[in-house]
Amino acid sequence: LRRGLLDQLSQGRIDLDRHERGAAFSLQQQQAFGLLSTGTLSDALDYTAEPAAVREAYGMTLFGQSCLAARRLIEAGGRFVTVFWDAYGLNAGSWDTHHNHYGRLKEFLLPVFDHAFSTLILDLEQRGLLDETLVLVLSEHGRTPQIDSKPAGAGRHHWSRAYSQVYAGGGLARGTVIGRTDRHAGDVEATPISPKDILATAFHLLGFDPDTTVPDPEGRPLPLTGTGRVRPELLG
């Protein structure tokens, strides 16, 4: 799998090197083109170049090493980096805990995430990168307040009425918990913040006007953030 990924990256780099229209790109496109068509990308993704102590600090898991690669990409000039949770290990290792919810959290999900994420934030801080890096830990929904007692046992299912997310760096407030649910964690009781609000706030922190519109396929103006608004509660 890793060799195949490396081969794909190498072939993509060769294809980009042959691209004759690179000079006509905008500044942003040229920056992206340059990152992909030089050794910078492959060097940044080579997390094995890090000292063993650093790799172990992130955790010797796919997610941990992916967070380390993300930090290296940021250092190399990457402007947008996504780290997906790896789905392997105990019960496929995903957060989609329709069964064995608590066992999966305790034995795999929480230890691996806490290990890698806390190290990433500390590493970014120590390298002077956290203030200029917006870190968002996002999911499309939460889990049901009720625990399923069917034969599969102890599962929690999809729930979008209330769920939490974690943010760090990039001009955000630190050490703050915003909002409150009822005692069952089923509904928001105070300070609801929508996904569109998060998008608007992120654009604001990145220097974009959240009210910007882009043309849809028919040429009509489409708001980037819909009805989202910048939330001052999130700002540092």
Question: Model-predicted segments: where are they?
Answer:
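Ligand-binding pockets and gating/stacking loops
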Residues: 1-236
